[in-house]
Amino acid sequence: MIILGIDPALGSLGWAVVAKENAQLKYLASGIIRTNSKDAIHHRLAFINSTLEKVILEYQPNMAAIEETFVNTNSVTSLKLGYARGAIMSLIGRYNLDMREFKPNTVKKTVTGYGHAEKDQMLHMIKLLLSGTALITNSDEADAVAIAYTCLVTKNY
């Protein structure tokens, strides 16, 4: 089972690919998709879509796991995040991948044992749980790894 974990965002989206082979979890790859806030939103969404599509084609995931988002007090920010999630979900649907959504507190509790863990705690635990993640320093990327990890350990694959 290969999971594509996604920490959705319009400006700095984290993605990660984690596999489960013979009851062993294996980190395959991860990265950040950054868009320029000065670009038109449709160009930013197209860039996210085309970059994630390359990841899907390279790693052939069976499923995508995406973090649920909360409504921000800033309605414009929430709307833009909704656009990014829509573009991501459309791509997931186009490749006929199963998809699971996880609340941030669920991901934190699964990875650290504490549902309100800080970003540095998440990063530390990801590095302990999955070999190959030692060079990850970006919290968006670490969150994507954590989302994929959560999907694999909570869904009994």
Swiss-Prot record:
Q: What is the superkingdom listed in this entry's lineage?
A: Bacteria
Quote the record's binding site residues for Mg(2+) 2: E67
Alphabetical list of Pfam families matching this protein? RuvC
Question: What keywords is this UniProt entry annotated with?
Answer: Cytoplasm, DNA damage, DNA recombination, DNA repair, DNA-binding, Endonuclease, Hydrolase, Magnesium, Metal-binding, Nuclease
One GO-annotated biological process of the protein: DNA recombination
Substrates-to-products reaction catalysed: Endonucleolytic cleavage at a junction such as a reciprocal single-stranded crossover between two homologous DNA duplexes (Holliday junction)
Using the record for this protein, list the coiled-coil segments as residue ranges, or answer none.
Answer: none
Compartments where found: Cytoplasm
Q: Which CDD domains match?
A: RuvC (cd16962)
Annotated Mg(2+) 1 binding lies at: D7, D140
Note the InterPro entries from the entry: RNaseH-like_sf (IPR012337), RNaseH_sf (IPR036397), X-over_junc_endoDNase_Mg_BS (IPR020563), X-over_junc_endoDNase_RuvC (IPR002176)
Q: Its Enzyme Commission number? A: 3.1.21.10
Keyword DNA repair part of the UniProt annotation:
yes
Top-level class of the enzyme under EC nomenclature: hydrolase
Give yes or no: UniProt keyword Acyltransferase: no
Quote the function comment for this protein. Answer: The RuvA-RuvB-RuvC complex processes Holliday junction (HJ) DNA during genetic recombination and DNA repair. Endonuclease that resolves HJ intermediates. Cleaves cruciform DNA by making single-stranded nicks across the HJ at symmetrical positions within the homologous arms, yielding a 5'-phosphate and a 3'-hydroxyl group; requires a central core of homology in the junction. The consensus cleavage sequence is 5'-(A/T)TT(C/G)-3'. Cleavage occurs on the 3'-side of the TT dinucleotide at the point of strand exchange.
Note the NCBIfam families from the entry: ruvC (TIGR00228)
Q: What protein name does the entry list?
A: Crossover junction endodeoxyribonuclease RuvC
- Organism equals Rickettsia africae (strain ESF-5)
What does UniProt list as this organism's lineage?
Bacteria, Pseudomonadati, Pseudomonadota, Alphaproteobacteria, Rickettsiales
